[in-house]
């Protein structure tokens, strides 16, 4: 693999541990002669030399070959939704909790990071989902997600009614708390908590998981990744919401359609050469170790 020469660095430096990791990486890379730029809002929170270059996130995406994101999975998701628009690889340093998307240990970050920057890595394409709300035939909002798109009530613990179509084929109507449409990346997030299956990130598929359905026969459905999923809100619902990765929210009125499909651009995840997906699952989910 080709080495990286132009490196972007960003993170939400809201605690001292994250600040130290960002400052350590900055100092080490500048000392070794790498061309480094920090995301401007990140740099404002750090104690760095004045000569450190800074760029806005869109400009960083245009300039850099790889972006290093320091933080938890939430920080990684936010950065990835923006950076997927550019021809840039993304790697994470875990300063959060589980860290499914952030491979590098902050306490031992420089050795594996330098190995990656020198060309010892592999690339994994992760697809995103897009959501569009259609009101009376016109688009009223769009969003995209790395993990999942969720249809739910704007009230707490409130049942809704909707119909599900896949490629314009009617699947079911249902009364439940909502529906989760997740990518393979998101299959270990909210979807997993709702009883959904774990999908290997290399699969071209998405999973549809209903939330607390008012039926005993409801089960998760896995569909082709190129499918178009349409959710139609019942006319007697109150206002509903679409959430993209738990952040971007759009209002859904009674009778609206929500179109969910693969986003045209993918995220280029960069992993260390020894990355093992099943080791990550076993470690993060606390599965048992080998018996023999």
Curated annotation (Swiss-Prot):
NCBIfam families reported for this sequence: PRK01231.1, PRK03378.1
InterPro entries listed in its UniProt record: ATP-NAD_kinase_N (IPR017438), ATP-NAD_kinase_PpnK-typ_C (IPR017437), NAD/diacylglycerol_kinase_sf (IPR016064), NADK (IPR002504)
Protein name, per record: NAD kinase
Database matches in PANTHER family: NAD KINASE
Source species taxonomy: Bacteria, Pseudomonadati, Pseudomonadota, Gammaproteobacteria, Alteromonadales
Example GO molecular function: NAD binding
UniProt cofactor(s): a divalent metal cation
Keywords from the named record: ATP-binding, Cytoplasm, Kinase, NAD, NADP, Nucleotide-binding, Transferase
């Amino acid at each position: 693999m080709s080495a990286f020469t132009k490196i972007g660095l960003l993170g939400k430096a809201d605690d001292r541990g994250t600040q130290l990791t960002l400052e350590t990486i900055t100092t080490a890379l500048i000392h070794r002669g790498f061309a480094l730029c920090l995301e401007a809002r990140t740099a404002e929170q750090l104690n760095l030399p004045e000569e450190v270059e800074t760029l806005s996130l869109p400009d960083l995406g245009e300039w850099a070959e790889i972006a290093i994101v320091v933080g938890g999975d939430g920080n990684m998701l936010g950065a990835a939704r923006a950076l997927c628009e550019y021809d840039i690889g993304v790697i994470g340093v875990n300063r959060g909790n589980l860290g499914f998307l952030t491979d590098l240990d902050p306490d031992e970050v420089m050795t594996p990071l330098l190995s990656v920057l020198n060309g010892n890595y592999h690339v994994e394409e992760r697809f995103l989902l897009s959501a569009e709300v259609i009101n009376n035939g016109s688009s009223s909002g769009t969003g995209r997600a790395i993990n999942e798109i969720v249809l739910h009530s704007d009230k707490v613990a409130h049942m809704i009614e909707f119909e599900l179509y896949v490629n314009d084929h009617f699947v079911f109507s249902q009364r439940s708390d909502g529906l989760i449409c997740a990518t393979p990346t998101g299959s270990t997030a909210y979807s997993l908590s709702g009883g959904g299956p774990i999908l290997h990130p290399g699969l071209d598929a998405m999973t549809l998981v209903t939330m607390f359905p008012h039926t005993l026969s409801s089960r998760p459905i896995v569909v082709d990744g190129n499918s178009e999923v349409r959710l139609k809100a019942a006319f007697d619902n109150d206002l509903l919401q679409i959430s993209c990765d738990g952040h971007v929210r759009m209002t859904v009125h009674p009778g609206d359609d929500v179109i969910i499909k693969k986003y045209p651009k993918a995220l280029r995840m960069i992993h260390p050469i020894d990355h093992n997906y099943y080791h990550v699952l076993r470690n993060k989910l606390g599965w048992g170790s080998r018996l023999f």
